[in-house]
Amino acid sequence: MTNGTKVLKRDGQTEGLNLEKIHKMTEEACEGLAGVSASQVEIQSGIQFYDGVTTAEIQEILVRSASDLIDLDAPNYQFVAARLLLFGLYKQVFGDWKKGFPSVRDHLVSGSEKKIYDPTLESKYSDDEWSKINSWVDHNRDLTFTYAGLRQVVDKYLVQDRSTSEVYESPQFMYMLISAAIFAEYPQETRLDYIKRYYDAISKHKINIPTPIMA
C-alpha cells in the first residue's frame, strides 16, 4: 500500500511511499522485544515524511523515531532503534542483504579493489583457513547492540568515506578482519585459535578494542 508521498530511491527513480514495507521493517525491528510497539514507531515517524524524501532519510527518520521513544519505562526501544539503524547499514553495504551475506574473504577482496583494505591480507591465509574464518562470523551478534553502542561504532569506527558518509563494512566483518589482521603473522598452528577467541571476545563485547586499532 502506498500513499501520495513520493520517495527518491538510491538509483534515482521515484516511487510512492510504501507503508506496508515500512510496517514490515518496524515489525521486524520489534520482534521478540517486550514493551515496544511497531505502531508507536510508525506514528512517531509518519508526520516527518515529505515529497522527495530519500530511502536513506526514511531509514534515519525511523531510527530517530524509535530512539525518541527510549525511556525508563520502555528501555527496549534502544534495541529497536539499533536494529533499524542496522537494517539501513546492511542495505548500504550489502544491497539486498536478505538474500545472504558475502563471505568475509569476498568482502575483503571487494574492499581491497576499492582500496579500503590492505590487499595483502587475503594472501596470508589459505583457502581452508578462510573457510574456517568465515564459518565463525555470526551476524546475529549485531542484534545485541544498543542504539548508543551501534551509533558509536557506525559513526566512529566502521570503514567509510567521510565526505559522503558511505559505509563499507558491517560490525561483524570489522571485528573479524581486525582479528585476521592482528594474528596474520602468528604461527599457522595457533593463529586460527587466536583469531576465533579474539573475535568471540570483541564481537560479544566482552572486551573493548583500543581506539587506534578500530580506527
Model regions and ranges:
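Extended catalytic cores of very large enzyme megasubunits
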Residues: 1-215
